[in-house]
Structure formats: C-alpha cells, structure tokens
Amino acid sequence: MKTFFQFDELGTSYRNEIIGGLTTFLSMAYILFVNPITLALESVKDFPEALRIDQGAVFTATALASAAGCILMGLIARYPIAIAPGMGLNAFFAFSVVLGMGISWQAALSGVFISGLIFVALSLTGFREKIINAIPPELKLAVGAGIGLFITFVGLQGSGIITANPSTLVTIGNIHSGPVLLTIFGVIVTVILMVLRVNAGVFIGMLLTAVAGMIFGLVPVPTQIIGSVPSLAPTFGQAWIHLPDIFSVQMLIVILTFLFVGFFDTAGTLVAVATQAGLMKENKLPRAGRALLADSSSIVIGAVLGTSTTTSYVESSSGVAAGARSGFAAIVTGILFLLATFFSPLLSVVTSNVTAPALIIVGALMVAPLGKIAWDKFEVAVPAFLTMIMMPLTYSIATGIAIGFIFYPITMVCKGKAKEVHPIMYGLFVVFILYFIFLK
C-alpha cells in the first residue's frame, strides 16, 4: 500500500495521512448539515412543504456522495483532495433553479446528472483543455466571487439579518430578536476562529452557535446524537426518472451552469491544493485527467443518490498543512463521511440561523481571488464586475454568468480584441442572448 500511494517518494507516513485526512474532514464536515438545510430551502418559510426535498435523504446522500468522491480521488488520482457537494452550487440548485425558476428538485437532480455525464466525457478527452482555455481568467474569478456574494446574501437573508423592504428592496432586520442575535454571535465566533487559523473553524463555529442556541432556547435539544441512517428512498433514482423534464432551453441553461461552475471550481481547487502540497511538475498537474474523472464521477453518483453537484474542496488544504500528501488521506476522509451517516439526529439542531454563519464566512472566502482581476483593463473589468454583482442582485447565479458572458465579447470587440475571444465564448454569447429573449 505504501508503494501504491508513493509514501517514500512523497515523504509521508500513515500517521501523517490519517491526521491529514481527519483534519480535512473536520474542516468540511459542516457541509453534512448545511447541504440538507440549503437544498430543502429551510430558510424560505412560505415554500410549500410538499415541494421540499427530504432533508434526511439529502443528509445521507451528502455523506455517501462525499465518501464515494473522496475514495475515488484517493484511488484513481491518488491526491489528498476531498470531494463533497459544493457550496454555491447547492445554493444555485435551491434558490435559483427550484425557487427562482420553479423547476422541481427532481428535474434539478436530472440536470446535475446530465452535467455530470458531460463532465465525465470531458475528463476522458483532451477537450477539457480547450474548455479551460476558452473562458478568460477574469470571468472564472468573477464567477467564483459572485457565487460567494450570493451565498453570503442567502445567509444574511435566511437568518433575518437582512429583510425585504418595499422602498429599498432590502434593509437590516430586527437585530434585537433572538434568532438574529444567534446568527450574529455565530458570525463573530467563526470569524475569530478563522482569524486565529483554527482548523475546522467553520465547523467548530457551527457547533458553538448550536450550543448557544440550545442554552437560550432558540435551538431544539436533540434527544439523541447517534441514530439510524436516514432512508434514501425519497431521492434515490429521481435523477434518471425525471430525465424527460430536461428538454427545454431553460434546463439547458441550468445544465450549462452546473457544468461550468463545477468544472472550473474543480480545476482551480486541484491546482491550488496540489501547489500547496508540492505535487505540481513544471506548472502542470500530473494525473489531472484522473482527478477530474474522480470528481465528475462523484457528481453522477451524487445526483442519483439525491444531492447537488459535488466538487473538490479547497478545505483539503488544511489536511495538506497537517501533513497529507497522498490519496490515502482522501480515503481516510471518505471513511469518516461514511461513519458520519449515523449522526443524522443532529440535523434537528442545525437551523437556518446555525448554518447562516457558515454561508456568510464561506462566501467571504470565495471573494478572495478578486485581487487577481486586472481592474485597470475596462474591457475585462466590466464583464467581471457584472458577472459578480448581478448574481446576488438578481438572486440567480445563472443570470450573473449570462450577463457577464454577453458583455465580454462586446467589450473585447469594441477594444479591437475580437480575435482574442475564443469561438466558444461567441457561441455562449448567442445561447445567453436567446435565453434572455425567450425565457426572461
């Protein structure tokens, strides 16, 4: 086993890999509780109960899809990179697709399933490099930052810190109410933990927020901690049962968004974590195709089980910092996700006010790369800015992407740089124009 995972070559050991895998798990364990709450639109109180996805099934699907993704990454690509349903992508699934477009969660899972199959095909061919090179780096960065702003807004809104206002659209909520104060407490605690660089700061912040909520009667006290694994029956297989529902221009945009965000989120995370671990060779990632295949395969598995798009987690960097260097650490993380399926009773503790701090803080982390955008170049700065700002303002990640991708060819052509725009970008320009003409 040491030979397979190249322990000697990488200068690692079982101890380092186990500690690294555990550290990564604790750093991203929050997704087990945030994902069900998000996909079920728990913060939207007037959403019909009959149309909500089952939280228990999503919890199990999240754990199993994460376990499968981590183990595949460890075995196929042999990288210490963990996989789980992506923050931002789950918000797009719930708030943009289900709530905003009125698409059923079953059809949305079908969209995730198809995007995963396309991702698998791209991972097996050389076309993936063409896709990566087609999208300008400024737009890639803007999409990530825009999603960060979006999920931060979702967290602020769902917790009651921001509420609706007929004159100004939004305003600050009742900051004297218990639930809002609990969220503010959670944000402060989590920020302090992150500033102090405490491993698993987001997860620990959620735990402390939940405990504070129980002390002051704002969060129900669980009757048990360990219980039976929630059934997958409500969600399992819905992705392929509802495949006939995907044949529309609206669903095409949804699938493209799932594919685009998932693809570039994964590519960026792989490079970032591999660079930190010293695994890059001549500025290239060895076995990149295998890593993308592991990631894309987990998307298909997750959709069938009943969760939104999975992706490589940048929190894997915490495991690398703790000593992880090989795929063995990812397998350790995967096994821990399997064990986590028995902790479903804790879902009752994780209210929208407990998860809101995680959304707000993770959103802030996603905005960090904005400094890499050439803001002094107006032809790329404007499309990037519009991509980013229109996501929270229109409450739609897809709309933000569409607007940015429409403006980019326009500004580049006006600047006399038409030849620098990849043909794929012109194709997307036409697709998104048709999207606004016929669907908006």
From Swiss-Prot:
GO molecular function, one term: purine nucleobase transmembrane transporter activity
Entry keywords, A to Z: Cell membrane, Membrane, Transmembrane, Transmembrane helix, Transport
Cellular location(s): Cell membrane
Keyword DNA damage: no
Pfam families named in the record: Xan_ur_permease
Effect of a null allele: Cells lacking this gene show normal growth on inosine as the purine source, normal hypoxanthine-guanine phosphoribosyltransferase activity, and are resistant to azaguanine.
Membrane topology recorded in Swiss-Prot or TrEMBL: Multi-pass membrane protein
Cited InterPro entries: Azg-like, Azg-like_bact_archaea, NCS2
Stated induction or repression of this protein's expression: Expression is regulated by both purR and xptR regulons. Negatively regulated by hypoxanthine and guanine.
Superkingdom to which the source organism belongs: Bacteria
Gene Ontology cellular component annotations, sorted alphabetically: plasma membrane
Residue ranges of the TM segments: 18-38, 57-77, 81-101, 107-127, 142-162, 175-195, 201-221, 251-271, 291-311, 327-347, 354-374, 388-408, 419-439
Family to which the UniProt record says this protein belongs: Belongs to the nucleobase:cation symporter-2 (NCS2) (TC 2.A.40) family. Azg-like subfamily.
Function in brief: Involved in the uptake of the purine bases hypoxanthine and guanine.
Name the record gives this protein: Guanine/hypoxanthine permease PbuG
